[in-house]
Amino acid sequence: MNANPFLKGSLQTIILKLLEDNNEMYGYEITQKVKEMSGGDVLLTEGALYPALHKLEADGFLETFTQVVDNRVRKYYRLTEEGGKQVSSKLSEAQAFIDQLQTLLNLKPAVK
């Protein structure tokens, strides 16, 4: 993953939101979706992604299942009911953090 500490601290939130939007995804698919959504600016490494996925699973926010695709076993992740609740909580925390940064640094919201 890029060296940006803000992104590292937001990885679980990003994963949860992606799974909320896409229902179920496998690891490589998550990395490619983040790359696509960021215009190539955010590159998730396996070393960053899989520990975050395993932590979310251990915390009961994700469940997994496997499926054979092209003679390869692929591990998919999806939100549990508790994980679904966690998404809105994490998004609220992220929004509050962004609001605080904008206030403290006197930043204007980005317009795209």
Tell where the protein language model's regions lie, with residue ranges.
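Intrinsically disordered, low-complexity serine/threonine- and proline-rich regulatory segments
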Residues: 1-7, 90
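Short, contiguous hydrophobic alpha-helices characteristic of membrane insertion segments
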Residues: 4-5, 61, 112
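N-terminal helix-turn-helix DNA-binding core of bacterial DNA-binding proteins
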Residues: 5-48
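Basic amphipathic alpha-helical segments that dock to polyanions
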Residues: 49-50, 56
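Beta-hairpin "wing" of winged helix-turn-helix
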Residues: 57-73, 78
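Basic, amphipathic "hinge/linker" alpha-helix immediately C-terminal to the N-terminal HTH DNA-binding motif
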Residues: 73-91
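Amphipathic alpha-helical dimerization/coiled-coil segments
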Residues: 85-112
